[in-house]
Amino acid sequence: PPAAWNGGRTVTGAVRREFIDFIIRQYNSRGIPIRYTFTNPLIKEIHLTDPFCNMITRIAENGLNEIIVNVPVLEDYIRKNYPRYPLISSTVKQIEDRDALLAELEKDYKLVVLDYNWNNRFDELETLPHKDKIEILVNPYCTPHCKRRKKHYEFLGERQFEHNLQVFGNEKQALKPIPKKEFPCPNMSFDFYDTTGFETHVSPQQIYEKYVPMGYENFKIEGRLMHPADILESYMYYMVKPEYRDMLRLKM
């Protein structure tokens, strides 16, 4: 927080440079890349010079860390100015057309995060090329084929700009309260297990019995800003055998 380029969720607050360095170091020392989610759909050329976004991009450019991109103007800027970053195509693009997806898979991306509406359409998934380049979003919180999803992403992007100005703007902007706005969506109050009833939900059994045998190997858990209990449950569900979950819950 509060990077203006951030998308998908509105991240508020502020963070010190020392803490950013600490987080990057802790992940990278274990061989784990950090992945910036620079997918704000409202980014224009005027936002490319944002000092905070360029600072955090510069200090993490080491060939290991990654960036998720959505808007071409920012993608081109990153490719030109920070060429060591592997880039990932965002699910925010909402690519449901097969021909458009095939074209996306041929581009120079490390991964393409599949639109969740492709999930569990096994006959079609079987025929897709470059399965090792596709990442599956396994627990989408959004309603399948939601007609307001694009507007919701734009609303969150606008809110991100407002929070960025409050932290980094001039004195007048910093003192100006952020207008109270809401995007009414019942899914915002869902917990992890509410999402398991969606047709787009991918269970651990499906991962191992369907997706992996097909050749898929990249899976993404949604919910980075959910309640810690929800995040914990999603990790338990996908990464811990059922007989060990209660024991680990107590230890964590």
Task: Explain the meaning of each model-derived region.
Residues 1-101, 109-252:
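Active-site pocket-lining/capping segments in soluble small-molecule metabolic enzymes
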